[in-house]
């Protein structure tokens, strides 16, 4: 086997991200012994798992959530999205920085900070990390009843989450904020990881590209055996290494979803300090900025993020001017 020198830290991750270091599999197995069944030496003689194995990835997530966030019970149903924890944590930490920038550099902690997670999914990872790291109160929304039932099960199985995370069903699949944001409530942040693709065919093509990348990274040829593995993994509704249709694609894809979100945000602009959304494709940004100009957002920020060679970013916008942001802070963050 060949050997290579690996950096101690993963490049690009936020300084407060608990996952900047390479995975300590001995520590993770100690926290969650079932992970041991999936740990093996890769071609570089480093401990790892097979990231193409959905059960291995889910078990790694269970270990990470238990070891670093004290989540004793976490699971997702088959065919739901199993998110990478380090990248999800980065978004949360960057949101904390966004709030701190408007609070004289002081990080707002505690349940006075309210966050709306659009499309929280069955995994509930954003609210878990945000609550455990900063004590924030979360409202998670989704159009999928099964996803919310599973998320509610996670809350119920982990007493520390009770009272800090509430879940709401979005009954209108074409709406984002309408129907879930109540008239009298306010949010300091909204966050969202929007569907990436515009169709099932595009989602399947994206999955094929991921499989090809994984095979290359594992040193495997792209021949008959690889096609046979793909055929087995792609059976049924398994797309993109897990994910329900609404998690992976929607009308208009990422650009269409974000454009609808921006248009709706204007109607509840007084009730939220900062709206934010991940933007996976840099090519989507011009359309996002056009939509924001159309609703006359007061301020727009684009925050770049990276995990190794994977580049991403989120866009944040507010309808509150500078005086309005100061008034918001005085009114809602006095005890933060």
UniProtKB/Swiss-Prot annotation:
E.C. numbers: 2.1.1.181
InterPro entries with a match to the protein in the record: METTL16/RlmF, rRNA_lsu_MeTfrase_F, SAM-dependent_MTases_sf
Biased composition (Basic residues): 212-231
GO BP: any one term: rRNA base methylation
Major location (coarse): cytoplasm
Subcellular location, record wording: Cytoplasm
Catalysed reactions, as listed in the record: adenosine(1618) in 23S rRNA + S-adenosyl-L-methionine = N(6)-methyladenosine(1618) in 23S rRNA + S-adenosyl-L-homocysteine + H(+)
Top-level taxon in the UniProt lineage: Bacteria
Protein name: Ribosomal RNA large subunit methyltransferase F
Record lineage: Bacteria, Pseudomonadati, Pseudomonadota, Betaproteobacteria, Nitrosomonadales
